């Protein structure tokens, strides 16, 4: 009886470990796909962007968002995974040198330090938003 219980618990533990390792590559693959997109498209890296109270964002991967302003879209890369942006509250930079300017390497958004900011065209933003989605997954 104890041997059977030990085998069942071992199998359950292995199944949990296998599930955990299966989830991580998908996230890493999406982040790598965004990095490849930046390299292939040779996106222009910016030092700063002008923000306002009406700005919005869309999470692309754990370390990337598309920051949408009235005039332009930007790809923002964080120094680490930023889970604080998934609750969809209004985006506000935490630390700023200037009121309506967000700077890469210095400012943070909801505790996540901005590593890089890239300028995007409308077509590039649309392509990044669809990254990782299967055909027909949006209604």
Predicted segments, located by residue:
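Helix-rich interaction surfaces within compact, conserved domain-sized segments
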Residues: 78-139
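Positively charged n-region of N-terminal signal peptides that target proteins for export
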Residues: 1-4
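Generic detector of short, well-ordered, non-transmembrane alpha-helical segments enriched
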Residues: 12, 49-50, 113
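Residues that line or immediately flank small-molecule/substrate-binding pockets and catalytic motifs
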Residues: 8, 61, 121
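N-terminal secretory signal peptides
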Residues: 18-77, 133-136
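Bacterial N-terminal signal peptides
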Residues: 6-15
